[in-house]
Amino acid sequence: MQEIQKLQIAYPDGHIDVDDYLNQIDQQSHYTVFGIIDAALKGDSIKVNKIFNSLVDDATPPVILISSLYREIKALIVMSIELKQNQQIDSILNNHRVWQKRKPLITNALKVHSYQQLQKLLLTLGRIDRSLKGMDNLNVYDELRSILITLSGKIQWIR
């Protein structure tokens, strides 16, 4: 009911077209850490940036994103090792209890990233965590965005 009231306030004359409606709905969307990780695994860097900006604006604590990314990248590393051991991808996904909906995302990530690339992302994530705790000097938000964009398969400038 609140969404209808918001639309009435935004469009007092009562006329709204499909594009305006979709734009309004998009602005009202609440993004989650899981959504940004799925967007990265899917390879959608534009959506990753959009969700990231929304999470920062909503003051989502970086530690939540760090822990979720750590868990996801760690699982990808283990699956990558199993893939190198010539196990079938379907078998690996089933053994790790990957939901049917996420299987294409995980499969895509395993095709795009090597074991070494995933390991490097995990090491960078560790530095980000240390920076958050004051033991390193990285810009936490810039580095988190960088990891997510890299996870989405986009090549970034080398520092």
Outline where the language-model segments fall.
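Short, charge-rich, low-complexity alpha-helical interaction segments
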Residues: 1-15
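Amphipathic alpha-helical interaction/assembly segments
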Residues: 3, 57-80, 117-159
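Small-residue-rich helix-loop
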Residues: 11-118, 156
